[in-house]
Amino acid sequence: MIVDTSVWIAYLSTSESLASRWLADRIAADSTVIVPEVVMMELLIGKTDEDTAALRRRLLQRFAIEPLAPVRDAEDAAAIHRRCRRGGDTVRSLIDCQVAAMALRIGVAVAHRDRDYEAIRTHCGLRTEPLF
């Protein structure tokens, strides 16, 4: 399962949220956790100091880092955005569209705390694990 940035942020903030507990449980159970390159990028820019970035990099490298399929994921992300807009929902983040395109391409769900993924689920058939 792909874990979106929104879930990682909850986990890294050590909150007692549903998302934080869910990810902690998956890690403890040694479940498959997929980290898209763009999610890794977002998490590495989240703090300005290099020590925190290095800690996050080491944490994320324990999991499956999934590369983008450059042209295919870009085209599919644009199509997802257009389809959602035609359906009356504007996805706020193109990175969410890229993550969704990757998830659809590799056949996995996305765990998230972001309403954009539910719009994508509605219009594009993305499998999701909402953790609000």
UniProtKB/Swiss-Prot annotation:
Highest rank taxon of the organism: Bacteria
UniProt GO MF annotations: magnesium ion binding; RNA nuclease activity
Requisite cofactors: Mg(2+); Mn(2+)
Alphabetical list of Gene3D superfamilies matching this protein: 5'-nuclease
Pfam families reported in the protein's UniProt record: PIN
Keyword Hydrolase: yes
Family listed: Belongs to the PINc/VapC protein family.
Subunit structure: Crystallizes as a VapB15-VapC15(2) heterotrimer and as a VapB15(2)-VapC15(2) heterotetramer; each toxin pair forms a homodimer which creates a channel in which the antitoxin binds.
HAMAP family from the UniProt entry: VapC_Nob1 (MF_00265)
Protein name: Ribonuclease VapC15
Species name: Mycobacterium tuberculosis (strain ATCC 25618 / H37Rv)
